[in-house]
Amino acid sequence: MIVIPRYTIIKEKASIRIPEILDNLNLKNPLVITGKNTQKYNKDFDFIYYDEIETSDLENLKNYTKDYDSVIGIGGGRPIDIGKLIAHKSKKPFLSVPTTASNDGIASPIVSLTQPSYMTEAPIAIIADTEIIKKSPKKLLSAGMGDIVSNITAVLDWELGKIEKLEKYSDSSGIFSKTIAIELMDYVLNSDLEEYPKKLVKALIGSGISIAIAHSSRPASGSEHLFSHALDNMKEKYGIDTNSLHGEQCGVGTLAIAQIYLEEGKIEVETVEMIKNSLKAVDAPVTAKQLGFDEEILSEALSSAHSLRNRHTILRNGLSKEKAREILEKSEII
């Protein structure tokens, strides 16, 4: 059964409507999962700081909610993911209250605390207070753009999986995911960005819903996400000190993967330029230097990305380091 949010509120001061939404859902006693910086947005309910929760013992998570009828996640990616996971394990409704907009986890059924990611259920409600989100660091909002443009290459990979591996494919989810990305890119390239935080939140929620429709991360996660995970591995392997975010890495990964599709004649050069210019418009990184990695690290990440998950993508059986470097040079990432 497809589960998508019953309530989606995206407006200034939306957070004051949390009690109303709970009442509409006949929920009386939620447990809030939040952080020390975002607890100030929780004025009414019992709470636990997300960094005090041990998530490795999955079966024990349901014990947190034995005295509660629902779970609310308030904050960025981690408190929302942990709240989602606790709600899933305890079979209770989850409400998402994002305080920033850096990835589509605010609305998707996916929990990305570990790799591979974990499938749960989409939030029953999403309450996005744009007054709060506008105040979040610009770097986080730029990362959100990277997560959205990655839908373009993710859907291309999904279509490739359908053709070459006879994978199940949802036309409605694929079209929805691509349209969301194109509409946001069109907005940032043709406006003064005054409404960017609100438009971004809408796009991220739509992206999350496309995942819920497909019951798979396929419409929003492809080879560009594998590249991002490979970069995370490089950080750990070589002790690289960079504060690059998931969405930023996915944005740069999208440029690299789009170059491969361009060479195979499966994407228009205008679309590739649109992706790059959209990232630039919101000051998201488009080069290795802006991400904080040297050229060799990016080449290694791109050449190893295919091995991180059993998922068919344009990377197929992998690129040599030489070919990876060529792709990165042609896309002007290095």
UniProtKB/Swiss-Prot annotation:
It catalyses: sn-glycerol 1-phosphate + NAD(+) = dihydroxyacetone phosphate + NADH + H(+); sn-glycerol 1-phosphate + NADP(+) = dihydroxyacetone phosphate + NADPH + H(+). Keywords: Cytoplasm, Lipid biosynthesis, Lipid metabolism, Metal-binding, NAD, NADP, Oxidoreductase, Phospholipid biosynthesis, Phospholipid metabolism, Zinc. Gene3D superfamilies: 3.40.50.1970, Dehydroquinate synthase-like - alpha domain. GO terms for cellular component: cytoplasm. InterPro entries: G1P_dehydrogenase_arc, G1PDH, Glycerol_DH. Zn(2+) binds at D147, H225, H246. Substrate binds at D104, D147, H229. It is found in: Cytoplasm. Pathway: Membrane lipid metabolism; glycerophospholipid metabolism. Its main location: cytoplasm. Binds 1 zinc ion per subunit. GO terms for biological process: glycerophospholipid metabolic process; phospholipid biosynthetic process. GO terms for molecular function: glycerol-1-phosphate dehydrogenase (NAD+) activity; glycerol-1-phosphate dehydrogenase (NADP+) activity; metal ion binding. Pfam families: Fe-ADH_2 (PF13685). Its cofactor is Zn(2+). Its EC number is 1.1.1.261. Catalyzes the NAD(P)H-dependent reduction of dihydroxyacetonephosphate (DHAP or glycerone phosphate) to glycerol 1-phosphate (G1P). The G1P thus generated is used as the glycerophosphate backbone of phospholipids in the cellular membranes of Archaea. HAMAP family: G1P_dehydrogenase_A (MF_00497_A). Belongs to the glycerol-1-phosphate dehydrogenase family. This is Glycerol-1-phosphate dehydrogenase [NAD(P)+].
